[in-house]
C-alpha cells in the first residue's frame, strides 16, 4: 500500500493522556481514527471466537468482561498474541479503509493506535508519528486513580508496552503531558501550529 501522506499516528503509553489529547484535537477540527473504539466493537462482534479462545471465565452477565480478559492477556504474552491474531487484522483493515477516505481531504488527520511503536511493521504506510509523553512515575499515578488496578496489574500493563523513553527518538512530534489540562491544551495548540506549517495547510 502506498504512503498515507496526511496521516499522523497518535500514540503513547497507558496513562500518558492520549485520549485527552485525541479529544482536544477533535475540538480543534481534526479527524481522529480511534483504534480502541474499533477494537471494542469487534470484541463484541467476535465474542464467540474470543470465548472459544479464552473460555467462559471472561464473561460477566453474558458479555465479555474486559477487566477479566485484560488480566489474562496482559499477564501472558502468548495469550495476548492469540487475541491479537484474532482482532488485529480486521482492526488494521478498518483503520486503513477510513484513512483512505480521509486522504482525499488533503488535510492532516490522526490515527490513534495505542501500540503503534510496538506494531510499527504493520503500518509502514504511516510516516508521521505523535508521541504523548509522561514519565513512568506519573503514568503509574494516573492509572491508579483512573482504573483502580493493583500495582501488579499496572506493572503487567506497562510491561506489555515498550518503555515510553524508547519511543521518544522514534517520534516526529512529541507532546509532553506532565501538567494540568490547561498546560496540555496550550501544548496541543502549539503542536497544531507546527503541524499546519509542516503540512502547508
From Swiss-Prot:
Signal peptide range in chain numbering: none
Alphabetically ordered keywords of this record: ATP-binding, Coenzyme A biosynthesis, Cytoplasm, Kinase, Nucleotide-binding, Transferase
GO molecular function: ATP binding; dephospho-CoA kinase activity
UniProt subcellular location: Cytoplasm
Name listed for the protein in its UniProt record: Dephospho-CoA kinase
Catalyzed chemical reaction(s): 3'-dephospho-CoA + ATP = ADP + CoA + H(+)
UniProt domain DPCK: residue ranges: 7-201
Family under the similarity heading: Belongs to the CoaE family.
Record PROSITE patterns: DPCK
Keyword hit for tRNA processing: no
Assigned GO CC terms: cytoplasm
Documented EC number(s): 2.7.1.24
Amino acid at each position: 500500500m502506498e504512503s498515507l501522506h496526511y496521516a499522523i499516528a497518535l500514540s503513547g503509553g497507558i496513562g500518558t493522556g492520549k485520549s485527552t489529547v485525541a479529544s482536544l484535537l477533535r475540538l480543534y477540527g481534526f479527524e481522529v481514527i480511534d483504534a480502541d473504539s474499533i477494537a471494542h466493537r469487534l470484541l463484541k462482534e467476535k465474542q464467540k471466537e474470543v470465548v472459544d479462545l479464552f473460555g467462559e471465565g471472561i464473561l460477566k452477565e453474558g458479555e465479555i468482561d474486559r477487566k477479566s480478559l485484560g488480566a489474562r492477556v496482559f499477564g501472558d504474552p502468548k495469550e495476548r498474541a492469540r487475541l491479537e491474531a484474532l482482532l488485529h487484522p480486521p482492526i488494521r483493515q478498518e483503520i486503513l479503509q477510513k484513512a483512505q477516505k480521509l486522504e482525499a481531504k488533503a488535510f492532516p488527520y490522526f490515527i490513534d493506535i495505542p501500540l503503534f511503536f510496538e506494531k510499527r511493521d504493520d503500518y509502514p504506510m504511516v510516516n508521521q508519528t505523535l508521541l504523548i509523553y509522561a514519565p513512568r512515575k506519573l503514568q503509574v499515578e494516573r492509572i491508579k486513580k483512573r482504573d483502580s488496578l493493583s500495582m501488579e496489574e499496572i506493572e503487567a500493563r506497562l510491561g506489555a508496552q515498550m518503555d515510553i523513553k524508547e519511543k521518544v527518538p522514534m517520534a516526529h512530534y512529541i507532546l509532553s503531558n506532565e501538567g494540568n489540562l490547561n498546560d496540555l491544551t496550550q501544548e496541543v495548540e502549539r503542536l497544531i501550529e507546527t503541524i499546519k506549517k509542516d503540512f502547508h495547510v
